[in-house]
């Protein structure tokens, strides 16, 4: 007969053996992680793929889609990091801002899944819903978990269930407004919710990065969704790693009251329905192209709206761009339009920044999201995967138009003789592209942007600012023989992306808003 001490000893031994067998039964390599609890019915096909195969797929997806920002080892220090604010998440700490679990808990798999699928509005994290399959998304969830020891040692707590959304009655909104003041929310978010409270410029997260306080009146700025249930969840869970604490010390009703107040202040007219990745279609026309963006030709061309991603957090980013594409027997033309209340046409002073827009094309016959996602990275391409870029600049066009007006006003007068003693204007001599407001370039990754030689520049363009909008036309003939130019063939969709620089936001170089790849179909 065992003594009580012997019995306890053998129970512990059997427990350790059983745990070890269970752990080995689920181990698929160094990155294999256990599933999180309470997820029955949360998704389909999560466990259909064997563990080792799933981890291999996750590693492939991460390499092609995530490593540029989050880094090969998940530390948030990818090659794009220097151009981004907020910085990409450091997965090694196992701290995730969006969760349905209580404060301090690890997220559930489905929380990470939702972040990947929906993206984080207002940041450089796009929505990968149309880019990744279900299997790919769940695979990369498991791969990401492998960067942190927390997933090996902790089990996430069960998800918080918010319950039904109560009616946003006037008394609930009034109570929420009072609580907003009592909880001193205005210290960060401001009394008008615009994110300009007295503490807004003094906040840092646990990574010692400055925190950007978003405009809570802008529904596009809610990272985790602007529906009442989304706002309630953020108030309940907080945003781990940031000064945004949870408000669990308030009653459930009080949190719903604050939710009702915040939701009542949303400027819903700012919501723009547009896709991260869509299909664009070029229209075949018989007309000759002109560079005027307001020519009647463009009235006959259908318009598509593409969503833009700010690489640097800002209060009023350009959120979308409108695209029209046309093709005739000799050339291709595009009309781009976006909102911009103030035209920034000059960069002559060091404190001035100009407006600009660019189109980016993947070279060669590459398809989107096939063969292991081997398309170029939409952010300037990557090594061995060159992109062709057309950039229009407002300051260049202003200089050209000013020069034309000056030439007309001074016909018969040799200004070079008067000003430079017969020598050519030295500034003009240093700007070989100044006869057109468009420059054609190539890149194969960050830091490789290279203008094409002057003799190879064959893209024309013109921009017009009118009624708070920029409209820009790009034009190029189809017969380019330059191997670094995009060839517009009809056999498969062309990958095209867009970027906008807003001078009022001090945009320049890598500071801009961009799109993901779009599929352009030619007639």
Residue ranges: model-predicted function:
Residues 29-61, 151-181:
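Electrostatic cytochrome c docking/interface patches
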Residues 266-344, 435-441, 446-448, 452, ...:
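Order/disorder boundary and secretion-linked terminal/linker segments
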Residues 321-324, 459-465:
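Beta-strand-rich interaction surfaces with strong enrichment in secreted/lumenal proteins
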Residues 11-19:
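Bacterial N-terminal signal peptides
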Residues 82-129, 134-145, 202-250, 255-263, ...:
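Extracytoplasmic electron-transfer domains, predominantly the class I c-type cytochrome c fold
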Residues 52-71, 168-194, 200-206, 258:
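Sequence/structural segment immediately N-terminal to covalent heme-attachment motifs in c-type
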Residues 466-523:
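Long, compositionally biased interface segments
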Residues 305-430, 486, 490-510:
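Surface-exposed, glycine/proline- and aromatic-rich loop segments on solvent-exposed faces
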